Amino acid sequence: MRRHENLFGFLALAALWGASYPAIRAAKAGVDPVLMAALRFDAIGVVVLAYALARGQSVVPGRADVRAVLVGGVGIVAVHNGLLFVGQARVTGAIGSVVLATVPIWSVGFAAAFLDSARPTPSRVAGVCLGLVGTVVLAVPGPMAVDAPDPVGVGLLFTSAAAFALAAVGLRRESPDLGVAARQGWMMLVGGPLLHVASLLAGEPQSVSVTPRVAIAFGYLVFAAGAVGYLLYFGLLDRLGPVEINLVSYVAPVFATFVGWYWLGEVVSTNTVVGFLVICVGFVLVKREALRAAIAG
């Protein structure tokens, strides 16, 4: 029974997070991307902390939690999501989800550089290189391309994936006392105000034009992909571990592509499919030993 629950939760998380990429594009019609990210994490932070309180968890950060909250709030919430929302506003949901699927690959590269326990191996190096190749395939249009992706958007998403991976590796060096939900809530409430500052510095209008589509998309980003998605992620992380959870990145593009096609009329190019397959091969090379252990277990 638990195995089926985990499978359902995994697919639900992939669907929720995959659909968030076209939702970002839909919401940009009413609010600029950095302000959108700021408002989203203001709301999610409050919801997640309320969840932690309702579960009887401590939400008061101690000295051991401060650095972890800052690393996550600045690196993951502010930098990663700021770049993600700006980049995603320039490309299709399918392309955005595929570029973000490189996060586990870059995590291994940064771990090899900054963590003593993570030694580079030929297969890991090859996997990281394939991740780069897959991203280039996405960004460079083929000879038959009609509607080439915006290379600036792909570049921003690529940098967003790298920022997430670097911050995640930094968090592995920390030993916080707070539970995952409370810690994530504080990260969001640190990153949200930073995104507001970035929005002001970028000269974005501090206003929201609400239409039915914008309201649905933003509500989805906050409550479905945000609150429900993160809580699903917390539970699955405890039960499945980081290796299997990383596979969500490789299922999410399926849902991102379908929702983008159905809701926004987005077209999937051959480059997107080829780039995704190359990135998948890179992931298998990087995570070969961990995947073998997970299957054997």
State each model region's role.
Residues M1-A38, I44, G127, V146-R173, ...:
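Glycine-/small-residue-enriched transmembrane alpha-helix faces in small-molecule transporters
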Residues A19, A23-A26, G30, I44-G62, ...:
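Membrane-interface helix-cap regions at the ends of transmembrane helices
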Residues L39, G96-T102, V169-P193, V222-Y262:
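Helix-helix packing/entry segments at the starts of transmembrane helices
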Residues A15-L16, S20-Y21, V47-L100, W106, ...:
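Specific transmembrane alpha-helical segments of multi-pass solute transporters/efflux pumps
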Residues V48, S107-G109, L115, V128-G131, ...:
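Transmembrane alpha-helical segments that form core, pore/gating elements
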Residues G30-V79, P104-A111, A162-A167, Q184-G203, ...:
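Transmembrane alpha-helices of multi-pass small-molecule transport proteins
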